Amino acid sequence: MDLSSLRPAKGAVKNKKRVGRGQGSGNGTTAGKGNNGQQSRSGYKRPIIEGGQVPVYRRLPKFGFTPLDKKPVNTVNLTQIDKWIQDGLVENEITILDLKSLLHASNADYFKILGNGELTSAITITAHAFSKSAEEKIAAAGGTVVKAFRTLEEASKVRDLPFEEALLKPKAKLVKRAKKSTKP
């Protein structure tokens, strides 16, 4: 026996059923849909009419909504960060770009550091948010916390600042100004 003689088990591979290809094929004429009527036509869907009974979509209440400003957030625990340090993936600093590559995230994602676990070495971590316990544990290990205000996508659009500075600069808040009247 060699690799060139390997074949799939008998009955494991079936030919695709091609319907509507003549009567001799066994699936011609009506293409497996039976005889005439609404159900044999294209575009037919089984109705959800329940015959006088209040339909399911009206019996069940409406609930919940998705906020328009919801942001995709990737969370990282201190145990994971400590493992990265021990594996040699990061040294004494973790930036947003490091988090993106280590977590396989997109440019639009936010990163939050959670305090599950312990840190064994001092490290500087840049992220968008930190839990209280994470901040305390990082400080206890001799590390520092740097908060970023923009995603990678937003920082790349800032023209007058270098990329690293744009990440850390807060976004400008819109100020509504009263219109000046043109009347004398």
Curated annotation (Swiss-Prot):
Biased composition (Gly residues): 21-35
A Pfam family matched in the record: Ribosomal_L27A
Matching HAMAP family: Ribosomal_uL15
One Gene Ontology CC term in the entry: cytosolic large ribosomal subunit
Keywords attached to this entry: Ribonucleoprotein, Ribosomal protein, RNA-binding, rRNA-binding
Keyword rRNA-binding among UniProt keywords: yes
Domain of life: Bacteria
Annotated segments matching region Disordered: 1-45
Role, per record: Binds to the 23S rRNA.
Organism: Pelodictyon phaeoclathratiforme (strain DSM 5477 / BU-1)
Gene Ontology biological process terms, A to Z: translation
Protein name (record): Large ribosomal subunit protein uL15
Gene name for this UniProt entry: rplO
